[in-house]
Amino acid sequence: MQENSQTFYHILSNGIKIVHRWTPSPVAYVGVMVGAGTRDEKPEENGMAHYIEHCVFKGTAHHSARHIIHAIEGVGGEINAYTTKEETTFYAAILAEHVQLTLHLIAEMILEPCFKKEETEKERMVILDEIESYNDTPSELIYDDFENLVFAGSSLAQPILGTRKTLRHLSSKPEY
């Protein structure tokens, strides 16, 4: 990629790519994109990327979910994530002076999640509710029909949330 005067691209020795753009704002936006989405799932794993996205917010080997949320929100930040067909992204808006803390916590969430069965089962129920809500939204369903038509036979035709059937069969200790 070509650098411009405000955006810088770095590749670390471990292959992780970093994009940095300086702005004079006191607020910084940070994100980590993991190259795993619906397109990487086998039919029986459909919904796994989205399930893992939810589960990593339930704590790490070193910090509880409550500690992570309080650490970010306690300094005025917000943290969230989303899953697409191509990737899963974890991101935050934070005062610039707290970027290092935020990146550390996001990295810990991704690299050292603690999948406790009780918590992952709660997330399974949350996602089952999401699926129910999604299935009550005609505009979402027509979009799924379109993707099924265009991407028939491909993992890209699979819904990001998974299905009730596949979600019930995913392990409560997901591996990734």
Please state what every model-predicted region is.
Residues 1-67, 91, 104:
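His/Glu-rich zincin catalytic helix
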Residues 61, 68-176:
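Acidic/histidine-enriched segments that form metal/cofactor-coordinating
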